[in-house]
A protein has these predicted regions:
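Alpha-helical repeat scaffolds
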Residues: 42-43, 69-82, 99-110
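Alpha-helical junction/boundary sensor with strong preference for TPR arrays
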Residues: 31, 48-49, 78-81, 112-113, ...
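Specific register positions within alpha-helical solenoid repeats of the TPR/Sel1-like families, i.e.
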Residues: 29-32, 57-65, 94-95, 127-128
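Residue-level recognition of tetratricopeptide repeat
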Residues: 19, 50-55, 82, 113-119
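Asp-box/WD-like beta-propeller blade repeats and closely related beta-sheet repeat scaffolds
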Residues: 103-107, 111, 115-127
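TPR-adjacent "capping" and linker segments in tetratricopeptide-repeat scaffold/adaptor proteins
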Residues: 2-22, 74-85
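Alpha-helical segment of the N-proximal tetratricopeptide repeat
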Residues: 16-44, 48, 85-104, 122
């Protein structure tokens, strides 16, 4: 097996902007690493593409790490992929406290998208003292 044989799939990103996608990925990486520039990266992604749902979710999660309540961004179901809808639901359910349902949704989502870094990391935020 070659090193490239294993691919950690992520949900398809509904942005046409490569720059927004780069800011999103850098912002999520910074968020899970606890780096202060996460919100700036995610803000840049949403500024470049105001309809980029996952970047808006990332910003809301970044705000929640600072103690703000999680406010899910509105979704337009016709414009987002199934993977993005799952991602949005998992974040909302996790941060609103339904731990058992969140675990089940997360498990199902990660079978298809094991590289969804925010979803992999999210339980750490939901634990007492984890954020």
């Amino acid at each position: 097996m070659t090193p490239n044989a294993i691919r950690w799939e992520v949900p398809p990103l509904t942005t046409t902007s490569v720059e927004a996608a780069i800011h999103y990925r850098d912002g999520i990486a910074a968020l899970v690493a606890g780096i202060a520039s996460a919100d700036q990266q995610l803000l840049a992604a949403t500024t470049i593409d105001p309809g980029f749902l996952l970047a808006h979710i990332g910003r809301a999660v970044a705000d929640a790490t600072g103690g703000a309540p999680y406010v899910p961004p509105p979704t337009s179901s016709s414009l987002v992929t199934r993977g993005e809808r799952q991602h949005a639901e998992i974040v909302a359910v996790t941060l609103c406290g339904d731990v058992h349902r969140a675990r089940d949704l997360r498990r199902e989502h990660l079978l298809e998208f094991p590289g969804d870094l925010l979803i992999v990391w999210l339980p750490m935020l939901a634990r007492p003292g984890g954020g």
